[in-house]
């Protein structure tokens, strides 16, 4: 069974449509809104915006 705490695992999916994603954790008490980060997508070979999706 999963650990019930303030930190949850989230999937950051590329908006370039390549299907590439990162997994990271976030504190659900401090960061309640969906995260958006600009990270490198090796499939697209450039920096793109990654949006939070459910795992």
UniProtKB/Swiss-Prot annotation:
PROSITE patterns the record matches: RIBOSOMAL_L33
Entry GO terms, CC: cytosolic large ribosomal subunit
Gene Ontology molecular functions: structural constituent of ribosome
GO biological process terms held by the UniProt record: translation
Keywords for the protein's UniProt record, in alphabetical order: Ribonucleoprotein, Ribosomal protein
InterPro entries named in the record: Ribosomal_bL33, Ribosomal_bL33_CS, Ribosomal_bL33_sf, Ribosomal_zn-bd
Pfam families registered for this protein in UniProt: Ribosomal_L33
Sequence similarity: Belongs to the bacterial ribosomal protein bL33 family.
Name the UniProt record assigns to this protein: Large ribosomal subunit protein bL33
